[in-house]
């Protein structure tokens, strides 16, 4: 792997542009507080909101103090309760709750759950956020469920309907992880992204962080930043938070997410130095313009 690149090596060139996007805002109190700490530090520039969070109104009120962070909807089909009664009724095998990602994927692909119900649910989730009110810049989804081929066009259509310019195009990082489960995930995501590429209306930021999901570290950032190419736009997915075992009772979530390490990685003062050294400029979705040729960065709107 290449080492750090000095300023003298890359000075005078256009910077690489990086959106650091925190998933799961509204998931738990500790998660939202951890995300906002990173926003305050200036490292997180966007966050996706759980529209079906039972804490939504309270957590949305905290965002008022942070107008510089871009907000999107973290579309959900895999955790907690749906907002629409019709989808809840269709999930009777799971007591009206969202099942895990594999169960919902199987139900969608087998047409046991009609995609019209998914469209209505996601529309409700978007409108739930707009009613708060939140200005929405992007859509993504919990556990990348919107990348399922029957669902990706729905996410794109809803984005057009509501004037939301950006939809995450999630892709794996090869080669990143060598565990059996990670290789299976990355293989599946490679196939899904290839299928969905035919539906993409324009370029999307280059996606980063799948291989480090739940485990973003300083070492990863040190290896990543020198590799970002001048003039390209990237989105780094992250999951910072404050772990609270009194609040989070699911041992699987605690095992998967190292919220504290991600928060510490993104709050570390050396991150800003590394960004500057490698000529990487943090931006938000608000700084992007979609054109026929792809993404254009509104550099004149980026504060220095």
PLM regions and their residue ranges:
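His/Cys-centered metal/cofactor-coordination and adjacent catalytic loops
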Residues: 24
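Terminal accessory/targeting
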Residues: 1-20, 29-70, 74-138, 149-304
């Amino acid at each position: 792997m290449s080492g750090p690149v000095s300023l003298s090596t890359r000075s005078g060139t256009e910077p690489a542009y990086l959106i650091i996007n925190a998933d799961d805002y509204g998931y738990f109190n500790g998660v939202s507080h951890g995300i906002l700490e990173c926003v305050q530090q200036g490292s997180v520039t966007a966050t996706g909101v759980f529209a079906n969070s039972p804490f939504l109104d309270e957590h949305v009120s905290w965002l008022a103090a942070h107008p510089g962070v871009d907000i999107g909807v973290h579309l959900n089909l895999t955790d907690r309760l749906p907002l629409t009664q019709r989808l809840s009724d269709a999930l009777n095998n799971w007591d009206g709750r969202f099942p895990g990602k594999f169960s919902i994927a199987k139900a969608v692909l087998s047409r046991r759950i009609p995609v019209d119900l998914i469209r209505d649910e996601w529309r409700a989730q978007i409108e739930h956020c707009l009613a708060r009110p939140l200005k929405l810049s992007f859509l993504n989804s919990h556990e990348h469920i919107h990348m399922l081929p029957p669902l990706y066009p729905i996410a794109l259509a809803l984005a057009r309907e509501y004037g939301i310019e950006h939809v995450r195009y999630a892709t794996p990082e090869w080669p990143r992880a060598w565990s059996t489960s990670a290789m299976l995930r990355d293989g599946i995501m490679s196939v899904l992204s290839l299928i969905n590429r035919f539906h993409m209306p324009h370029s999307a930021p280059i996606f980063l962080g799948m291989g480090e999901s739940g485990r973003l570290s300083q070492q990863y950032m040190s290896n990543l930043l020198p590799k970002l190419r001048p003039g390209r736009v990237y989105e780094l997915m992250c999951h910072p938070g404050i772990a609270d075992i009194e609040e989070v009772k699911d041992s699987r979530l605690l095992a998967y997410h190292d919220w504290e390490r991600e928060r510490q990685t993104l709050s570390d003062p050396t991150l800003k130095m590394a960004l500057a050294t490698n000529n990487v400029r943090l931006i938000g979705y608000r700084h992007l313009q979609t054109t026929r040729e792809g993404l254009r960065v509104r550099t004149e709107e980026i504060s220095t």
